[in-house]
Amino acid sequence: MQDLDPVETQEWLDALESVLDREGEDRAHYLMTRMGELASRSGTQLPYAITTPYRNTIPVTHEARMPGDLFMERRIRSLVRWNALAMVMRANKHDPDLGGHISTFASSATLYDIGFNYFFQAPTDEHGGDLVFFQGHASPGVYARAFLEGRISEEQLENFRQEVDGNGLSSYPHPWLMPDFWQFPTVSMGLGPIQAIYQARFMKYLESRGFIPAGKQKVWCFMGDGECDEPESLGAISLAGREKLDNLIFVINCNLQRLDGPVRGNAKIIQELEGVFRGAEWNVNKVIWGRFWDPLFAKDTAGLLQQRMDEVIDGEYQNYKAKDGAYVREHFFGARPELLEMVKDLSDEEIWKLNRGGHDPYKVYAAYHQAVNHKGQPTVILAKTIKGYGTGSGEAKNIAHNVKKVDVDSLRAFRDKFDIPVKDADLEKLPFYKPEEGSAEAKYLAERRAALGGFMPVRRQKSMSVPVPPLETLKAMLDGSGDREISTTMAFVRIISQLVKDKELGPRIVPIVPDEARTFGMEGMFRQLGIYSSVGQLYEPVDKDQVMFYREDKKGQILEEGINEAGAMSSWIAAGTSYSTHNQPMLPFYIFYSMFGFQRIGDLAWAAGDSRAHGFLIGGTAGRTTLNGEGLQHEDGHSHLLASTIPNCRTYDPTYAYELAVIIREGSRQMIEEQQDIFYYITVMNENYVQPAMPKGAEEGIIKGMYLLEEDKKEAAHHVQLLGSGTILREVEEAAKLLRNDFGIGADVWSVPSFNELRRDGLAVERWNRLHPGQKPKQSYVEECLGGRRGPVIASTDYMKLYAEQIRQWVPSKEYKVLGTDGFGRSDSRKKLRNFFEVDRHWVVLAALEALADRGDIEPKVVAEAIAKYGIDPEKRNPLDC
C-alpha cells in the first residue's frame, strides 16, 4: 500500500509514540480500539492482522531482569546437556535397540533450566506445588538434572531404558513406572496439552469449591511445535481462553522440525500458532530472537531487517542453522544490500552466534516472568530453538529426532562448546560428570530448588483417607424396586444421589457428563448440585420455573463438558489424580454412551491407568441389543474387551441394582479408603425391568465376578449351568425356565458381573501354580464355583463372544458354549435384535441342548425339535457377516 502523505503518517506515528511514552500501553490500546470502532461504524474495512511481526513479543526495554548467576547456570546447564547425551549413548552402546532421544532436550535445555531455577514451585505446606507436563522426549535432560541434584544415582543413569531388573529409568515420563518422580505421562503426542488444560480448569474448580487456596499454583505444559498437529493439542485451547485460565502456561518448543522433516517448511509454524492461540483469547508471547540480535534491531530504523525476517519461511530458517555463518550472510542478509551493510563488521563466526530466543536465558526468563504475572488469560510461549542444538552433525538436520549416537569429532565439539571437563582420551567412554558434593555448582543447584520449595519433578503417592459410607446406605437398591420397573442407569443415578448426601464422601464426588445428563436421567442433579461455571450464571435459564432447571454456579459440583468426550475424560483424569496433585482425594463419575468411551478416548484411558487415576467410568446405554434403536454406531458390544487391555482397570457388567450398589461401594472403598491405584469401568443399561432384592451372601461373588443366582434343585435326568451378564442375564433366566418346562432339563443360573475379573483371577492362579511345582495347586474362582456342578456350561452376554470366551480354560466342563453379539449393530426392537445376534432365550436353550447332545446325553433330534419349536431359521445369515 502506497503512502500518499508521509508527513501525515509520521504525525500519527509520533502521536502514538507520545501516548506510549507519557501514558502507557493501556491508554494507547484504548485509543486504538476507539479509532477502530469509529472506522468500523463508518464502513471502513480494517486491516486484518491476527499475527504480529516475526520478532519477540516483549521489547528489550520491558524485559524483566534475570536475578541469578548466568555463568553458573550456563555451567550447570552444560553439565546437564552432557549427562543427558552420555546417558542415551551409553544405553545404546549396551544395547543398540534401546533407543532414546538426544535432540529434543538439546533444543529445550534452556527452557527447562530457567523453569527449574526460577519458576517451578515444589509442593510445600504453604504451596500446593506447580504441575509440570514435561515433553516426553526430553526426559533424558530431566534425569540428568536430577543426577546432579543427587536424586538419581549413576547406576540409575546407567540403567536408562533398562527397568526389568530394577533401579532403572523409564524411557519417558510414566507415573506407573516411577510413582514418586513423574506426575504425568506425556509422550503420546497431544495428550499432555489437553490434560494440562483440564488440570488447570480442575484446579480452578477446586479453588471455587474451597478445597485448595486460590491463585498460587500454575500448570506448565511443555510441548513441541510438531505435536501441535495432534487434534488433542489444540482442540481444547478455546476452553482455556473462555475460562480465563491464567494458571496455565504452554511452552511450545519451536525447533521447526518433527521426526521426518520441517513442521511447516513452506510457511511459519510460530506465526500459525500465534494466530490460533490469539484467536482463542490466549496471551501469546513469542521468543524468537536471542539478545545478540538486539544491536541489529536497534540499527533497523527502516524496518528492512524485520521485513526480511517476516518473509523468510521455516524451511530456510532450518537451512541457516544446518549450514554456517557464511551461508547465513549470503542467503539471509544477502537478500538486500542494506542488510549486508548492517553486518559488514561482523565475522562469519559472529553471524553464526546470532542466537535464537529459546536458547537465550535472558529472553526465556523475561517470557516466563511475564507469563506467571499475567492475569485473565492463559499464556502460550512460542520459543524458537534449534533441534539437536550443540550435537554437531545432527544439528538442525532432518535426521535430528532419531540421533542416538554422536561421532567423536562431534563429541569433541560438544565438549568444547559447553566446556565439559572430559579429556580427549576419555571421550569415547562417555563418562558421566558430577561436581563434588559441596562444590559451587552443587550448592547453587540446591539453593535454587530450596527457594522454590524442593526438587521437581515429584509425585505424591498417597493422600488423606476418606471414609466411605457402609453398604446399608444404599439399602433402597439392595431391597429391590418392588413392582416398579427401572433400568440400571436409573439405579446408578439414585446411588449417586444418595452418596452425595454423605457428609464425608459427598462433597468429593465429581459427576462428569458430556452433554448427556438428560439422556441418563440426571437432570435432577442440576438443581441439587449445580453445574460448575467459573462465572456463575449470568442469565436466567429458560426452565427457571421448573423443579429441575439448568442451574450454573461458581461452586457447582457437576462438570458439564458439552459434546466433548476427550475433554470430559481429561476432566475425569484431573479429578482422579487430585489425591496426588492436590492432596485432595476426589471421586469422579464420568457417564457416557459406552460406545463413545474406550473406543473414542482409548489413549486417554491408557494414560489414566499410567497416571494411577482413581474413579468410575460409567458406560451408559450399553449392550449391543439393549440400546436398540440407535443402530450401528451407538450399539456397544466390545467396550469390556477394550477396557480389559488396561491392567489396573476393573470392569463390571451388572444386571441388577443391588449388584451395581455393591460394586460402586466396594470400588469407592478400594480407591478412596485404601487408595489402591485402580479405576473402575461399569456398564449400565437403559432397559427397564423389576429390580429384585439381593440374595443373601451374594456380595463376595459380585465383586469376584460370579455368583449362583438360581439353583435348580428339582430332579432332572440332565442338568446345565447357564451364565449371563447385563440385560442378557434375564434372557438366561427365561431360558432356564424353558429348559425345565419344554425339555425337563434342570438349569442353574449364574450371574457373572465380570468375565474380565474372572480372567484376572484365573491368570493369577495359573501363574502361581506354574511357579510352585510340587505344591498343592490352587483353584481359580471359576473352578471353585463350577467344580462339582452337573452338566455343560453356556454363557451368553450382550458383547462379543470373546468376552465370555476368556474363562474357557478354567471351566471344568469340556462343553462350554459361548453366545455373543459379534457383528455390526443395527436398529430394531430388542426382541428382534437378540434373535438376530443369537443371544435370546431360545438361542440359549439351543446352545444348552447342543452341548448335551455333544456329550451324548440327548439325541441330536432333540436339538432339531427345538429349532423347529422356536422358529429358528437354520439358514439365517451369520450376524458377523451381515
Curated annotation (Swiss-Prot):
CDD domains, per database record: TPP_E1_EcPDC_like
Cofactor(s) the record lists: thiamine diphosphate
Reactions this protein catalyses: N(6)-[(R)-lipoyl]-L-lysyl-[protein] + pyruvate + H(+) = N(6)-[(R)-S(8)-acetyldihydrolipoyl]-L-lysyl-[protein] + CO2
Enzyme Commission number: 1.2.4.1
Source organism of the structure: Pseudomonas aeruginosa (strain ATCC 15692 / DSM 22644 / CIP 104116 / JCM 14847 / LMG 12228 / 1C / PRS 101 / PAO1)
Reported function: Component of the pyruvate dehydrogenase (PDH) complex, that catalyzes the overall conversion of pyruvate to acetyl-CoA and CO(2).
Entry keyword set: Oxidoreductase, Pyruvate, Thiamine pyrophosphate
Keyword flag Glycosyltransferase: no
NCBIfam families given in the database record: aceE (TIGR00759)
Protein name according to UniProt: Pyruvate dehydrogenase E1 component
Keyword match Nucleus: no
Subunit structure, interactors included: Homodimer. Part of the PDH complex, consisting of multiple copies of pyruvate dehydrogenase (E1), dihydrolipoamide acetyltransferase (E2) and lipoamide dehydrogenase (E3).
Origin: domain of life: Bacteria
Molecular function via GO: pyruvate dehydrogenase (acetyl-transferring) activity
Short name of one Pfam family: Transketolase_C_1
